[in-house]
Amino acid sequence: MIVTTTSTIQGKEIIEYIDIVNGEAIMGANIVRDLFASVRDVVGGRAGAYESKLKEARDIAMEEMKTFARQKNANAIVGIDVDYEVVREGMLMVAVSGTAVRI
């Protein structure tokens, strides 16, 4: 499945705009605290454990969005947006959304 932040896919014609699709992942109660504690693990200016958890949450949200698109018989998603939010103390949410299309 093609997933892009752009509104078009170069070299492809969008046959049908189907619906808005989204996916969310919330990292639980101790994740944010543990991640900040792991900042001590900074190597070369980057916090490896923190980046790993963000990537995991983003991957979960993206897969959920793709699943919803497939259920609607889409074969691509355009115009995706990725947002990161602290929903309350100790909880991080990654939300992705886009438009499911058929090319």
Swiss-Prot record:
Entry-linked InterPro entries: UPF0145_dom_sf, UPF0145_YbjQ-like
SUPFAM superfamilies referenced in this protein's UniProt entry, alphabetically: YbjQ-like (SSF117782)
Top-level taxonomic group: Bacteria
Pfam family, one: YbjQ_1
Protein family according to the UniProt entry: Belongs to the UPF0145 family.
Entries under NCBIfam families matching the protein: PRK12855.1, PRK12856.1
UniProt protein name: UPF0145 protein BCE_5284
Organism: Bacillus cereus (strain ATCC 10987 / NRS 248)
Lineage of source species: Bacteria, Bacillati, Bacillota, Bacilli, Bacillales
